[in-house]
Design a protein with these regions (language model features):
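Basic amphipathic alpha-helical segments that dock to polyanions
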Residues: 5-19
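Short helix-coil junctions and helix-kink-helix linkers
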Residues: 1-3
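Short amphipathic beta-strand starts and helix->beta connectors
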Residues: 14-16, 45-51, 77-82
């Protein structure tokens, strides 16, 4: 694991408040999982993984975007297959949408394939051509 990649992961953990840092008198640093970090430190059965589907949709779209280099083609193809197998909608070649929260599962998958630096996860309130997604997932936009 290279140092730049490790720093990026640690920075993400700080932002999400998953780890805390303590510095000892001799200057060494210790990273410790916070309670939130411990709750996120979950394991999945990769082959049987399923995404939770709540009773009601909150109107938010969860998006996975990636740009995985050709030298990691196996990981790119495996990630695509996994997202489709989990029920994601392929919005574009490397853009996948899902109507429910799935950040923990996506974090696990990208770590499993070792492609975190090439994958982004986001949440959208609205997107153009939403009708196609609503039809695919058999949803109606929630009324306020």
């Amino acid at each position: 694991m290279n140092k730049i990649y490790l720093r990026q992961i640690v920075r993400e953990f700080y932002v999400d408040r998953l780890v805390s840092e303590q510095e000892s008198a001799d200057g060494t640093k210790t990273l410790t999982l916070t309670e939130k970090g411990k709750r996120r430190a979950i394991s999945f059965n990769f082959g049987r993984m399923k995404l939770k589907v709540p009773d009601t949709w909150d109107g938010l779209w969860h998006i996975v975007i990636f740009d995985i280099p050709e030298k990691y083609k196996w990981a790119r193809l495996s990630l695509r297959d996994k997202l489709l197998g989990l029920g994601f909608f392929q919005y574009q070649k490397s853009v996948y949408m899902y109507p429910h929260a799935c950040r923990d599962e996506i974090d696990f998958i990208v770590e499993f394939f070792k492609v975190r630096r090439f994958v982004r996860y986001g949440v959208l309130k609205e997107i153009t051509n939403e009708a196609e997604l609503l039809l695919y997932f058999n949803l109606q936009r929630p009324t306020s």
